[in-house]
Amino acid sequence: MKKPKPNLKINLNKYLLHSSVFAIFTEALKYRFIIDLKLFYLILFINFFLLFKYKKVTLNRFFLSFFAFLFIHGCLTYLWIGIPPNFLLSQILGIALASSYFYNVLKLFTKEEVFILYAKYALILAIIGFPGYFFGFNLNVNYDPRFSSLLTEPAHYAIVVLPACYFYFKRKQYVSFFIIFLSLILSESSIGYIGCALMFILPYINLQRVKYALGVIPFVLVIFYFVYSNNEKVKTRFDDTFESLKVLETGKFDVRTNISTYALLSNLYIAKENFIEHPLGSGIGSHYYMYHNNYKKKMRTPKYLYTLELDDINSKDATSLFIRLISEFGIIGILATFYMIILIVRTFKDKSQIVEQSIGIYILLKLFRDGHYFPPELFFFLLIFYFSYTKSFFFKNEGNLSHN
């Protein structure tokens, strides 16, 4: 087979870079026909074909060991509990496709090329969202008036663009920072507000800057109190969540429990029950099955949620990645989470690790809010973080994005 001409190589690399970064913002671009036909999957299919034809598709030992663990752990727990294997296979297949794709694309470029382009796309996404927000027309399929630009919901928008917001802030590109930061405020997303707070708190958590951190915390509390006092949605969610924590023991929800609180606490209750009975977890992809077949009958769900057909809301992703890891991997999931948090904290001790810090904020928010294993952006961020942080031979250039 003839090798592609130099111009073709350049154009192909440019296409792979731009299409792959663009793909992480395409969660809402889908068409429902029996299953969700997503633009993200189409991009992966086309680009995988190009990679196989013109590049070298590889997997390293870490990937093979990781997939082997997921498969063996899943097989053992599924057989022991009696869970149908389709839950296991669908998750492993999705993770394998998304992770191997980004592994083989990202290794073709430097971190600078990848992350700077991601930040530019995030900025464009924010700018596109302002006309729709201020003039009152939706750019998306949802009917939520809050800021979400082209993404599925305000919370998902906040999680995806927050790394870019932090990146611009640390690079002192304040105009770009302010544009994205303003969009995060307008999203009125609790997870977005938490992420904004983390941007200013996490860089100062080392012992040498404890005094500064203590000074910032009251400022953050004042902002939270202001938002709490003036935003009825945030106030309702916070009050209901605080009052409903006792449901983790009983599983009996008050008839007035709001949807967001129910989504979080019902999945946390299921994860707790599953962890008690299966300390090593029930296997990847099993939370949904355990929710419906084992533990949902123990709960008292508000009747209005049955009317709205939301009685099992977020049961597929457990509402948060941490809750899902507890449910499906038990002690192993807890240890993996703490290990990841340690890695994230360490990045903030090195001023040069701006990219790693940016992604660290994303991971923390992901642990708290979204439990899906392969949304478009997840392995894009995870692979940059892991291989960059461990100094593995992955990118063409191991230098950090620390220069101005």
Task: Locate each region found by the language model.
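N-terminal signal-anchor transmembrane segment
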Residues: 1-53, 71-80, 131-138, 365
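A juxtamembrane structural motif centered on a specific transmembrane helix
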Residues: 1-15, 54-56, 171, 349-354, ...
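Hydrophobic transmembrane alpha-helices and their immediate junctions
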Residues: 6, 10, 314-316, 321-363, ...
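Hydrophobic alpha-helical segments of polytopic membrane proteins
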Residues: 15, 61-65, 166-236, 349, ...
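Transmembrane alpha-helices of multi-pass inner-membrane enzymes
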Residues: 42-45, 340, 358-367, 371-404
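Transmembrane alpha-helical segments and their membrane-water interfaces
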Residues: 48-55, 69-127, 347, 365
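Alpha-helical transmembrane segments of multi-pass inner-membrane proteins
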Residues: 113-142, 151-206
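Long extracytoplasmic/lumenal interhelical loops at the membrane interface
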Residues: 147-148, 258-329
